[in-house]
Amino acid sequence: MNSNLLLPDKNLRMQREQWKWTQMTLIKTHCKPGNKQCQHWRTNSQTTREGWQMLCPGKKWILNLLTRLGLNLMTTSRRDQALGMEMSLM
């Protein structure tokens, strides 16, 4: 795997003490009209599954990484499939 995908750009890195930890789980992602991406995140206190810890200030970088990895092409055609699909980043 390309190491550039694993780390944010140097100019986007924040000082270690500025990062705040929040447990989040990506529960759904789909395309809206106009090929716009829509992602639904939930804090782990709202779900029974243990999820991956992510950095709040790094959320935009993580969303961009997911887009580059192709998650923006995912679509969910039925509401019950969307509600049943819970994705935890490991």
Curated annotation (Swiss-Prot):
This is Non-structural protein NS-S. Expressed from the S segment by a leaky scanning mechanism. It is found in: Host cytoplasm, Host perinuclear region; Host cytoplasm. Antagonizes host type-I IFN signaling pathway. The keyword Nucleotide-binding does not apply. One of its GO terms (cellular component) is host cell perinuclear region of cytoplasm. It comes from Puumala virus (strain Sotkamo/V-2969/81). GO terms for biological process: negative regulation of RIG-I signaling pathway; symbiont-mediated suppression of host innate immune response. The gene is N. Keywords: Host cytoplasm, Host-virus interaction, Inhibition of host innate immune response by virus, Inhibition of host RLR pathway by virus, Viral immunoevasion. Belongs to the hantavirus NS-S protein family.
